Amino acid sequence: MLLGSTNTLRISSHGKEWEGKTLTGMPLGKVNQRVKVPASDSEGAITSKIKEMLSKVGLSVSSYDTAWVAMVPTLDSSKQPLFPKSLNWIMENQQSDGSWGLDLQHPLLIKDSLSSTLACVLALQKWNVGQQLIHKGLDFIQSNIWAAKDEHQHSPIGFDIIFPSMIEYGRDMGLNLSLNQSLVETMLLKRELETKSLKDKPSNLAYVAEGLNRLNDWKEVMKFQRSNGSLFNSPSSTAAALIHLHDGKCFEYLNSLAKQFGNAVPTIYPFDIYARLSIIDTLEKLGIDSYVSEDKERVLDDICRCWMQGSEEIFLDPTCCAMAFRLLRMNGYAISSDALANFDEKEKLLHTKDIKAMLELFKASQLEICEDESALCRIYAWTSNYLKEELVNGEIPDKSLQAEVDHALGHPHASMERKEIKNFIENYNADKVSLLKTSYRFCNANENYLLAFSFRDFNMYQSMHREELDDLERWVKQYGLDKLKYARQTIRSAYFSITSSLFQPNHSDARISWAQNTVLTTVVDDFFDFSGSMEELLNLIELIERWDEHTTIGFKSKEVEILFNALYGSVNDLADKAYIVQGRCVKRDLIDIWIILLKTMLKEAEWARDKNVPGMDEYIENGYISFALGPVILISLYLMEPLSEEVVTSKEYDNLFIHASIIGRLLNDRVTAKREFAQGKLNSVSLQVVGSNGAITEEEAKEEVTRIITSHRRELLRMVVQTEGSIVPKSCKNLFWTMSKLLHLFYMSEDGYSSPTKMLSAINAIVNEPIVLP
């Protein structure tokens, strides 16, 4: 990862790669205090606080970087500090134990304290001030120098190069460090080995330029100077360059920091883009971004402008670039993935063991919307392999990040949003600290407050969801659907499938529709497959076609009567609700959706009866409809927001449905091929094998099915994120994408929908088990 990431980083024990991880588990009450959202806080008050966080994010002061800035002499004399206010800040901000740095008291951040303290001591010694402070600082270093060789300590980036070099600087200044000579020699040797290991990585060496002293080729270092005059947006690296070269652009950069921050500087600047992206990402993961949707859009508008202008802050940082790409693309911004080609190989990253960067790149790589985005395919391949290796080898010590990586790898293209929100809330470390060359944290992003609010928000919604599920279970019994012994009983899975993503209170009717129609399509499908005679199937279709005149027809069996009454009562009820939303009667539309579905199911029943084997194209043309997403999605959409006749009859609307349905049909076929073949049912996998007369194996057929799924998923996502020329409302398009992610979840390795026990823990987590925070 480059600057701006929220990871903790350290030099690996092999001295070849910089590894990313996030610090968690701050042990002291001072750091771990929970913030409660007052019960009296209105939604407006809560929203106001979140808006404030989005408007501007501050970063903690860096004693380490401030010390390097304080060491810069005036350009016309080496006897005066160029930034005397920074020197004054150092003199006023020593901790009681003699150290400098964030007062975290974290037992694994002693190397960070050593580095910051020695840098501050050097600044004081250079200008011959604060002798008492120097002595206290040296006492701290001498008492804690053991941590410098402790591999269990979290190491700031470049510590093994910079810290021993600062010891040499101190000796040259006449400091009496009183350190064990053997230990110092060991550190110097390690520095040499580390430096040699990075000789073919000039950017890595340039980033820790302050630790290379006379060994450094400063002209080579300055090749990495950015347009704002900095080296890697790092005040310490830039200060070191200014000390040696008196570069005008370096001076302008540091002078701008002095004007903006006054006495002390952060460890990275600028950082605004990444910080605001991080807060938006956190709001989405906590499930509370809808409270500030307009502010979120304004922030993303700003970031999109920066993207279009080629911002170095975005494009030179893989974590920032990948996150910006993901959030912008999924929120409908027309941006190219070309920028990510800079990271399509692991070796192109500055820090090649940065887990957070790898994870962000992995997530971004799954957002392919056209065939020529080959860079995304390459990124997906190498990041997935790398993350799997790190996970298997136990190389991700942060448990929260480890869980996130494990989930991401296990659920590509799949999602149950509400369960992920709950996991994120339960594992969220609101007090996380990040580490570049020194530790830092966002100082005005009250993440404890966000955590407490999301906790309250989740449990409030969950109570509402439990009531809805109770109503649905009564509905099943009301129509006698539980008496259909041949049918799968799926009300919990059906409700879970939509509640996991469409959870807001204003979508209650849409959720009810989704769940009811999921149950109805399931029992009807089972009736057509296993229980109903051809006479009964035709009877049911005729009843639906006649609708209000059904009493003149009669029922061929009790099962037909139960099914029709459930359909008739439920569709009429949903049509009445849809009338309120649409301002017009759409009952005929809802009935026609069911008739179209039943006729495709009938065709498959006729194929089975007559032992006809259709071609692949004919099978898919019929099968995407018989997969039965029509009543589930299309009727629910009528209950979400007004949809004009132009929208529901448009080619765009139709294609969204087709792509989602084909994805579902083929995902189901891929995991049920053996079972359905044994049952004598048609399947896209078995059709290929049979149609080729054995020339195609089952595995090859599954690979072809996977290729088709990928193509339709890519096209579906393109349509979902596209805004130009689109007439389908964004929330409606998102529901098709939600269905795709749910289908990938249900059919990852087996038919999870037909095996509700596989989803039992997730169902309970979302509907029955409230979040309990310590």
UniProtKB/Swiss-Prot annotation:
Entry EC no(s): 4.2.3.229, 4.2.3.185, 4.2.3.19
Domain remarks in the Swiss-Prot or TrEMBL record: The Asp-Asp-Xaa-Xaa-Asp/Glu (DDXXD/E) motif is important for the catalytic activity, presumably through binding to Mg(2+).
Protein name: Ent-beyerene synthase KSL4, chloroplastic
GO annotation, cellular component aspect: chloroplast
Pathway(s) this gene product operates in, as recorded in its UniProt entry: Secondary metabolite biosynthesis; terpenoid biosynthesis
Transmembrane segments: none
Binding site for Mg(2+) 1: 525, 529
Keyword Magnesium annotated: yes
Cofactor names: Mg(2+)
Protein task: Diterpene cyclase involved in the biosynthesis of labdane-related diterpenoids (LRDs) natural products. Catalyzes the cyclization of ent-CDP into ent-beyerene as a major and ent-kaurene and ent-atiserene as minor products.
Family statement: Belongs to the terpene synthase family.
Binding site for Mg(2+) 2: 525, 529
Stored InterPro entries: Isoprenoid_synthase_dom_sf, Terpene_synth_N, Terpene_synth_N_sf, Terpene_synthase-like, Terpene_synthase_metal-bd, Terpenoid_cyclase/PrenylTrfase
Motif DDXXD motif positions after renumbering to this chain: 525-529
Species this chain originates from: Ricinus communis
Keyword terms: Chloroplast, Lyase, Magnesium, Metal-binding, Plastid, Transit peptide
Main subcellular location: plastid
